[in-house]
Regions:
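C-terminal motif of bacterial Sec signal peptides marking the signal peptidase cleavage site
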Residues: 16-20
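Bacterial signal peptide processing site
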Residues: 22-24
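An extracytoplasmic/periplasmic, membrane-proximal ligand-sensing/linker region
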Residues: 29-48, 263, 267-323
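A bilobed periplasmic-binding-protein/Venus flytrap-type ligand-binding module shared by bacterial periplasmic
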Residues: 35, 115-127, 256-270
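Short helix-initiation/N-cap motifs at beta->coil->alpha
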Residues: 63-74, 201-216, 255
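A ligand-binding cleft/hinge motif common to bilobed small-molecule-binding domains
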Residues: 85-99, 191-195, 219-220, 224-245
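Short beta-strand->loop
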Residues: 100-111, 201-204, 237-255
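A conserved helix-loop-strand patch within extracytoplasmic ligand-binding domains
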Residues: 107-185
Length: 323
């Protein structure tokens, strides 16, 4: 084995089964995931989920910890896992490489996807109207938006919207971009700019790490346009309260999918349906379950509305940047 796929997590039936999974072994399920929780609390965090699923399905359910998202795909392909909870790119790879079936999508803040936001400190150039204030509910704070991307009192963050305004970016524009592996900070923005006729290689790229630093760069005058998740300004309000008005959101890219849950292709259909239903209902099953789900994988829910086309589109963008 070229690398260690899983980290051991001790008790609570969290050992890795090295035997190949198959349709005849549906009396036991192994779930691979990359949890938010680290260290000694890991077994405690996984236990309630695996115990709940065992009770709902009537089969033994084990949880194993993958070293990273790519390792969840390796585990599924190697027959070391039946179910993976992973990010959108790994879902796409599992579907393409191992014919995995997508059964659930991750829900964060009530949504299965999010847009990359184009921010600016120069609304005179990028806004066709006066910026308006709309409430970003997750932070219970009003933020500035323009170009009609938020017509209501409460922001929704739904894209695409006003992407044509990216065409105002010229070769002398300082554009703040994050790592080339960042969907919201680089990949989707670059595709959107290129579709609007912007030669990204010609702009003055300002590299930063993290969505917080992307919007802070605008607040500090280090760039004119920046990209980040919706709404990155909320992450720096305490250190820079004026960022809610000084940095304006002026466009949304197409939606970027959250991750989800996929299963091996030969899983018994009845068990697969029961698994999807049980996981879909988990967050609502108890207050403890909701807390465990947030602490374990940073989610508020799962949903059976898989919107597979968003995952496939994400795969296209990944392939574009792998050339």
């Amino acid at each position: 084995m070229k690398k260690q796929i899983f980290a051991a997590v001790g008790a609570v039936a969290l050992t890795l089964s090295l035997t190949a999974c198959g349709a005849a072994e549906d009396d036991k399920l192994t779930i691979s995931l990359v949890p938010s929780t680290e260290g000694e609390d890991l077994a405690e965090a996984l236990g309630p989920l695996t115990e709940y699923l065992s009770e709902q399905l009537g089969v033994e359910v084990e949880g194993v910890v993958a070293s990273d998202y790519a390792a969840t795909v390796e585990a599924l392909g190697a027959g070391q896992s039946d179910v993976i909870i992973t990010d959108a790119g790994s879902l796409y790879n599992a579907m393409e490489q191992h014919n995995a079936e997508l059964i659930l999508r991750d829900v964060r803040f009530g949504a299965t996807s999010y847009s990359s936001v184009a921010y600016t400190n120069n609304p005179d150039k990028y806004c066709d109207d006066e910026p308006v204030m709309a409430t970003y509910a997750a932070a219970d704070t009003e933020m500035a938006y323009c170009n009609g991307i938020e017509p209501g009192d409460t922001a929704t963050g739904e894209g695409p919207a006003a992407v044509e305004k990216l065409g105002e970016i010229t070769s002398d524009t300082s554009v703040v971009l994050q790592s080339s592996t960042s969907p919201a900070g680089y990949q989707y923005p670059v595709v959107a700019m290129e579709e609007e006729g912007v030669n990204v290689d010609d702009v003055n790229q300002i590299p930063v790490e993290g969505n917080n630093n992307a919007v802070l760069a605008l607040a500090n005058g280090d760039g004119e346009v920046a990209f980040g998740f919706w709404d990155a300004r909320s992450s720096v309000i305490e250190e820079n309260p004026d960022i809610t008005t000084d940095v304006v959101a002026f466009a949304y890219t197409e939606q970027i999918p959250n991750g989800g849950v996929a299963v091996r292709s030969d899983m018994d259909p009845e068990l697969k349906d029961k698994l999807a239903e049980a996981m879909d209902n988990y967050a609502e099953s108890s207050d403890e379950a909701a807390d465990v789900m947030y602490d374990l994988v940073g989610l508020s829910d799962w949903t059976a509305e898989t919107q597979e086309e968003e995952i496939n589109r994400y795969g296209e963008i990944l392939e574009y940047f792998s050339k």
